[in-house]
Amino acid sequence: MSKIKEIVLDTETTGLDPYPTDTNPIGHRVIEIGAVELLGHVPTGKTFHQYVNPERSVPKESTMIHGLTNEDLSDKPTFQMIADDFLTFINGGVLIIHNAEFDLKFLNCELKKANKDDLSNFDFIDTLKLARKKFPSRQNSLDALASRFGIDRSARKDFHGALVDTNILSKVYLELIGGSQPDFTLDNIQQKKTSINTENNYTGQRSKKLTKRLKEDEIKAHSDFIKSIGGEKKWNY
């Protein structure tokens, strides 16, 4: 029975804009990536987690949010060093991101710096947009949604963390699409018409180009699902 591969994804950064500005001439950078794999909307136990040396200083106001300092990141690999491992992990998956525009903007900027293809060929689902459709007049931050659904968020009480946030978001996402259903597979969708922890384990260049993994019937069912919940088609099959 075929199941959709989804990657719940989050980043932490040194600031709000990866592009150079008058007040920030070198742009902000990604300093942490967390990702959790789902199959059929159920966590597989596979994760990607990596702290990243931003090759610039971390502002104090950013440290107050995620708790990461220049010293914490000084011995970590650069994004270019871990880019291939990251791309391998997310390959073939639909990206599930809260406020996707922010994370995709940063990741695409980092990938460009690393001379890699950006994420424009990936489908993605923005859980913030899903939440705003479901709760149009309410607060829809990750904290607010976790509280609304009774999901434990004590792990992010002091600081935000990419892997902590993806674990919370994976549970929030399942609630937003109708609750955790282990048998919610591609076959079900057709009928209804609707850890690898890689920290400090980067390998450099990918040995061969990534290949398409979905069959034609899986692609159609996957497309139906994306449409049914208001996801955005970006994946070039």
Give the ranges of each region predicted by the language model.
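Acidic two-metal-ion nuclease catalytic site recognized across multiple nuclease folds
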Residues: 1, 175-237
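Acidic, Mg2+-coordinating catalytic module of metal-dependent nucleases/exonucleases
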Residues: 94-97, 106, 110-111, 141-201
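Conserved non-catalytic scaffold segment of RNase H-like nuclease domains
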Residues: 1-122, 132-135, 144-159
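Short, well-ordered coil↔helix boundary/capping segments
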Residues: 136, 160-163, 216
